[in-house]
Amino acid sequence: MSTELFSSTREEGSSGSGPSFRSNQRKMLNLLLERDTSFTVCPDVPRTPVGKFLGDSANLSILSGGTPKRCLDLSNLSSGEITATQLTTSADLDETGHLDSSGLQEVHLAGMNHDQHLMKCSPAQLLCSTPNGLDRGHRKRDAMCSSSANKENDNGNLVDSEMKYLGSPITTVPKLDKNPNLGEDQAEEISDELMEFSLKDQEAKVSRSGLYRSPSMPENLNRPRLKQVEKFKDNTIPDKVKKKYFSGQGKLRKGLCLKKTVSLCDITITQMLEEDSNQGHLIGDFSKVCALPTVSGKHQDLKYVNPETVAALLSGKFQGLIEKFYVIDCRYPYEYLGGHIQGALNLYSQEELFNFFLKKPIVPLDTQKRIIIVFHCEFSSERGPRMCRCLREEDRSLNQYPALYYPELYILKGGYRDFFPEYMELCEPQSYCPMHHQDHKTELLRCRSQSKVQEGERQLREQIALLVKDMSP
């Protein structure tokens, strides 16, 4: 029976160009199943012939054979197929006429490899795969086609490489024809998808590289251009209306951005600034606001008034607030005699100043009215401010802080030099004698030496007073 089986398969394999491997395998297995009565088939689940054959291999007696008696004949693998005759000659039968176990294993491996190659090269799987997978499939198919075409030239080398690649000693991959159903439209769609993927990758690379571009390097001129937004034909909104709308919206946004709410911190800061400004307008004992309008001057700790205010004071415009005022001319006697403000007192030394104001302090009869003292010299830069500070310091020492005998002290800004040209009629005599006059050089030296002695005596008295305070318990 076995001889008839293999002779029939040999005749069928030799006739024509030869059927495929799977048809020959099925015929051979069906004949074996008819011969072997001990082979049982499960009718519940349909299986392939190879699966049936291997599933019940434990019950087969034909699998307990020896090794093959002859080597495989692989000379006919260049055609891409193998016939049943070549299979029977390569896998010998034992004495009982059954196939050897090694032959059956080779048949199983050949069937598995053939099924895998058919699944890999199916058109449906190629169409459903990604572009990268499609590209790899094309490369594998081209490689297999080129290898099958060159088998006729180099038989031995290509057989080894083909067997290593396929993992089977029997079967080879047949050359697959191109899918006839794959039309030009599908090919164009695949190429368009590949182009879109490549463009996206290029844009991502350009955007990432732009972050690390050096400022000194020139810009890349080969950057992809941005797509211009095409205007729709159905859009009937005029451009002027659009410009007006967006301009109005931009102004509204700017107004909202510039608006700032007042916080608690801002309120406290403004209150502190107002208090500081108000304190600058308060008198020395911080009880009232200054009666005369003040201006900024050279010394920030002193209050300055302009010539117009002094002229208004002399004309009696502040009688409702002021009971009595004094204009102290701190210049030397020859300057005072050369021209001075009406009613001004010439007190150029500290001793004279203290004796006039502090030996017997002047107190206003009306508590609601005030006593004002205005100091000046030629420019009101040194002598006038110095005498004003001396009187304030001595007044502080005689009273308990913040009480003062004379809380309102002012400096005439610009001195007699600025007052005389504007208000000459308020001067007696109507003339002006500068300090460095050529006719009064000796008097200038005498007055300076006298003032220096007085200044030294004053500093000595202050030091003695400090020592007495330190020694007292």
UniProtKB/Swiss-Prot annotation:
Ubl conjugation is among the record's keywords: no
Mutagenesis or variant effect for residue 130 to A: Loss of phosphorylation. Severely impairs PLK1-binding
Protein location: Nucleus
One Gene Ontology cellular component annotation held by this UniProt entry: nucleoplasm
Chain spans, region Disordered: 1-23, 132-158
PROSITE patterns with a match to the protein in the record: RHODANESE_3
EC number(s) recorded for this UniProt protein: 3.1.3.48
Record InterPro entries: MPI_Phosphatase (IPR000751), Rhodanese-like_dom (IPR001763), Rhodanese-like_dom_sf (IPR036873)
Active site residues of this protein: 377
One Pfam family here: Rhodanese
Stretches with biased composition (Polar residues): 145-158
Residue positions where Phosphothreonine is found in the record: 48, 67, 130
Modified residues (N-acetylserine): 2
Region feature (HIV-1 Vpr binding site): 334-379
Record note on what altering residue 359 to E does: No effect on HIV-1 Vpr binding
Reactions this protein catalyses: O-phospho-L-tyrosyl-[protein] + H2O = L-tyrosyl-[protein] + phosphate
Keyword annotations: Acetylation, Cell cycle, Cell division, Host-virus interaction, Hydrolase, Mitosis, Nucleus, Phosphoprotein, Protein phosphatase
Reported function: Functions as a dosage-dependent inducer in mitotic control. Tyrosine protein phosphatase required for progression of the cell cycle. When phosphorylated, highly effective in activating G2 cells into prophase. Directly dephosphorylates CDK1 and activates its kinase activity.
UniProt similarity note: Belongs to the MPI phosphatase family.
Complex and partners: Interacts with MAPK14 and 14-3-3 proteins. When phosphorylated on Ser-129 and/or Thr-130, interacts with PLK1. Interacts with MARK3/C-TAK1. (Microbial infection) Interacts with HIV-1 Vpr; this interaction inactivates CDC25C phosphatase activity.
Listed name of the protein: M-phase inducer phosphatase 3
